[in-house]
A protein has these predicted regions:
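Charge-rich, low-complexity N-terminal segments
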Residues: 1-66
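Short flanking/linker segments adjacent to small metal-binding domains or redox-active Cys/His motifs
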Residues: 146-172
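Short linker/helix segments within small regulatory modules
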Residues: 104-117
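Short Cys/His-rich Zn2+-coordinating modules
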Residues: 61-77, 104-106
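Accessory, usually C-terminal, subdomains that scaffold auxiliary metal cofactors
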Residues: 136-146
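Short cysteine-rich clusters marking metal-coordination/redox-active sites
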Residues: 89-92, 120
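Short metal-binding segments enriched for Cys and/or His
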Residues: 118-137
Length: 172
């Protein structure tokens, strides 16, 4: 992902359709503080509000950057047992236990519709496909997956492009 400053991010936010109340709650500095040198290995980045459950997801699978408002639900409950359910992320194909699972809802304020996907609760899919997180190591063992990190990154980019097309997003 290209390196962004607070000014760049503010310009992006003005280009997309976001609820005004969310704009003032977004925490760009807190959401990007861990990226001091690593912007190039990021395909998606969540800029969260103060609660961490809403925000703007920046997506850059190739050259173009996309942004979309999201809401995260960190509990996926099995209707039969009442326990948190494990999932496989729709973006990075990482297996997540119930404590690491979430569903993400993308909302278009002007179009009055939303789309929901299963995802990693930390939205660290770029790190998961590169096997730099503990969750990625556990997932690879659990799924008995033997493909290389480069192939996982390519798969993530392909899935992100599919989701961008499903949502009808335009580059910012």
């Amino acid at each position: 992902m290209r390196t962004l400053s607070q000014v760049d991010f503010n310009a992006i936010v003005l280009q997309i359709d976001i609820k005004p109340r969310l704009i003032k709650d977004l925490k760009f500095a807190r959401s990007t503080s861990h990226l001091s040198a690593g912007w190039s290995d990021i395909e998606l980045l969540a800029i969260e509000d103060r609660t961490g459950d809403k925000g703007v997801l920046l997506i850059q699978p190739e050259d173009k950057l996309y942004a979309v408002q999201y809401e995260l639900s960190r509990r996926i409950v099995d209707s039969r047992t009442g326990r948190d359910r494990a999932i496989i992320c729709d973006f990075c194909y990482t297996w997540q236990p119930g404590s690491g699972a979430a569903s993400i809802t993308f909302t278009h304020a002007s179009k009055k519709h939303s789309v929901r996907f299963l995802c990693c609760a930390d939205l660290a899919c770029s790190g998961h496909v590169r096997t730099v997180t503990k969750a990625a190591v556990v997932s690879r063992a659990h799924l008995k997956e033997s493909i290389l990190n480069d192939e996982r990154v390519a798969r993530l980019k392909t899935r992100l492009i599919e989701k961008i097309n499903d949502l009808g997003l335009e580059a910012v």
